């Protein structure tokens, strides 16, 4: 017989025992699930140069997580070395980590953060062999050229798509149009596209605007999630993305320019965000577009101060990028070059020009500096930004001018990013709409591909400029003024001749406007050549022009006309 109080005690003990059992069982289940999850992650196979992503949830409450909270992961690579990579906020309480592994074996990471939900999170995966090549880097042993991360030489062949990640209804620019554009360009051999992450016309995308307010640093994750989708598609088509985080404000009206952040720390925070979010893709970074514009539009600043600030922003981006992607910066037309940044520890390019004049010479001027040299803006085929029916950009008024400009650059050992009026700005600054299928572009698309196909058939990275080994009766001419109906534009020289050589093995001569004999010297100690082929850069047609005999010391040849021609001499 039990007293009333004893019955209550027995009932409570029974209930406590049941509750404890349930708690114990739940804890066991959680432990097993955690172990199972960890096992799944440990067994997750990720391609070498592939893409690993994992998510975590913060438990704290923050007014502005993008600004108020930081998180990073210490990554232990298979060789025992460690790198630190930032996590990025992706909306609500979600934080993500992205890694593109470059070494085979087991990778581990440990998250550090002031947030209890993030701090101490761990994970691992196994990097396995793949056919992926990775992003790009300066080629070891050939500093002015590119290679994939796996060491395969990379013939950088670019196109401009400043609005690749935005939408604009009036220009019929959206994700589907961008996919079609990428498909077309990939089929034409394009392997690089550089683009704005913050579009200077102020466009958003289907996710909305990039920031609700730049002054308050209220970032909109949905906008960046749409960029993720398009960038992944771009990479899947074999194209490297050149990403410009923001533009200089050259008109004081651009809604997402660098100057609109509240200060340097905000600019650096944004740079770190971009590195964390996009460094695992096949990309390179351009710290700013037209950086000189910030000098124009900020009161009481000097060029030196703005340059120092962009070096700091570049430092923040580079130091936050555990993948060590290439980094450059982009000038305004008046300056043309960014050689002044070659002392910055992050500068990976010998130059990243926007230049429309003296194209060949200005590539050569940058060769004393290490790193590949790119002219990233030298012409936009048939661009008509004021819609008056007439082209308004230098070198852009004909396929001939674009072709001459392109060959003048590559014959100095430089690389090109071309562009088309109908696509380079998403249809903006052209009559529009965004249209990769405009038949007017066909001729330049074909001729741009001809140059790429020719160079890719050679060990182009071994060719060095030797313009002093090619001679003609008259000197090379200068850039020419071309009169259109209502304006005069600059075009490449009418008469010129250039030579690239791997002495004793290969000689590539490009010439135009010649009416007589050109002479190519083979250089000291060369044994001569026994093969001479002629390329028509307008059509891609090639033919042999020697008689099978060895040509020693020098080669003399007269062009059939004053059009441009390419000679390839080899043994």
Give the residues covered by each predicted segment:
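N-terminal secretory signal peptides that target proteins for export/translocation
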Residues: 1-21
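Bacterial N-terminal signal peptides
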Residues: 25-37
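Aromatic- and carboxylate-lined catalytic core of secreted/periplasmic carbohydrate-active enzymes
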Residues: 43-47, 61, 71, 383, ...
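Non-catalytic, glycine-rich low-complexity segments
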Residues: 43-79, 85, 124-129, 491, ...
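Active-site mouth of glycoside hydrolases
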Residues: 70, 116, 130-360, 369
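Extended acidic/polar, glycine-enriched regions
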Residues: 74, 81-143
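Exposed aromatic-hydrophobic patches
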Residues: 96-100, 519-521, 552-559
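Catalytic-core region of carbohydrate-active enzymes that cleave or remodel glycosidic bonds
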Residues: 344-429
């Amino acid at each position: 017989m039990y007293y009333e109080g004893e019955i209550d005690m027995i009932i409570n003990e029974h209930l406590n025992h049941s509750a404890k059992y349930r708690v114990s069982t739940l804890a066991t289940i959680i432990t097993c699930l955690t172990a199972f999850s960890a096992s799944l992650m440990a067994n997750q196979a990720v391609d070498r140069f592939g893409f690993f992503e994992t998510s975590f949830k913060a438990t704290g409450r923050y007014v502005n997580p993008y600004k108020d909270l930081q998180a990073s992961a210490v990554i232990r690579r298979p060789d025992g070395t460690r790198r630190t990579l930032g996590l990025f906020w992706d909306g609500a309480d979600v934080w993500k980590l992205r890694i593109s592994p470059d070494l085979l074996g087991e990778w581990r990471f440990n998250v550090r953060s002031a947030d209890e939900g993030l701090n101490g999170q761990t994970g691992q995966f196994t990097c396995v062999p793949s056919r992926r090549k990775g992003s790009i880097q300066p080629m070891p042993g050939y500093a002015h050229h590119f290679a994939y991360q796996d060491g395969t030489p990379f013939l950088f062949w670019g196109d401009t798509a400043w609005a690749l990640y935005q939408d604009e209804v009036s220009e019929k620019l959206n994700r589907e149009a961008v996919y079609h554009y990428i498909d077309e360009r990939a089929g034409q051999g394009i392997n690089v596209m550089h683009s704005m992450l913050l579009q200077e016309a102020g466009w958003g995308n289907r996710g909305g605007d990039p920031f609700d307010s730049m002054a308050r640093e209220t970032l909109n994750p949905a906008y960046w999630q749409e960029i993720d989708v398009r960038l992944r598609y771009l990479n899947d088509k074999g194209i490297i993305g050149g990403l410009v985080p923001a533009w200089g404000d050259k008109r004081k009206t651009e809604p997402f320019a660098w100057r609109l952040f509240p200060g340097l720390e905000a600019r650096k925070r944004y740079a770190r965000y971009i590195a964390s979010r996009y460094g695992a893709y096949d990309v390179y970074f351009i710290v700013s577009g037209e950086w000189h514009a910030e000098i124009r539009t900020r009161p009481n600043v000097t060029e030196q101060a703005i340059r120092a600030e962009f070096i700091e922003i570049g430092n923040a981006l580079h130091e936050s990028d555990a993948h060590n992607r290439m980094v450059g910066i982009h000038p305004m037309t008046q300056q043309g070059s960014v050689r002044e940044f070659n002392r910055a520890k992050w500068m990976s390019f010998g130059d990243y020009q926007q230049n429309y004049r003296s194209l060949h010479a200005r590539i050569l001027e940058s060769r004393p500096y290490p790193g590949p040299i790119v002219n990233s803006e030298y012409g936009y085929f048939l661009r008509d930004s004021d819609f008056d029916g007439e082209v308004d950009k230098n070198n852009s008024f004909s396929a001939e001018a674009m072709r001459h400009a392109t060959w003048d650059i590559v014959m100095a050992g430089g690389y090109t990013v071309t562009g088309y009026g109908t696509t380079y700005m998403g249809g903006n600054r052209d009559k529009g709409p965004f249209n990769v299928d405009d038949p007017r572009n066909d001729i330049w698309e074909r001729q741009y591909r001809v140059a790429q196909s020719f160079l890719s058939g050679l060990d182009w990275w071994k060719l060095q400029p030797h313009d002093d080994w090619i001679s003609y009766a008259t000197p090379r001419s200068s850039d020419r003024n071309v009169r259109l109906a209502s304006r005069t534009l600059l075009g490449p020289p009418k008469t010129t001749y250039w030579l690239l050589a791997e002495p004793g093995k290969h000689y590539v001569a490009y010439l135009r406007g010649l009416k007589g004999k050109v002479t190519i010297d083979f250089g000291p100690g060369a044994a001569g050549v026994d093969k001479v082929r002629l390329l028509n850069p307008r059509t891609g047609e090639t033919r042999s022009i020697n008689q099978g005999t060895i040509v020693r010391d020098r080669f003399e040849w007269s062009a059939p006309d004053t059009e441009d021609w390419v000679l390839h001499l080899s043994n």
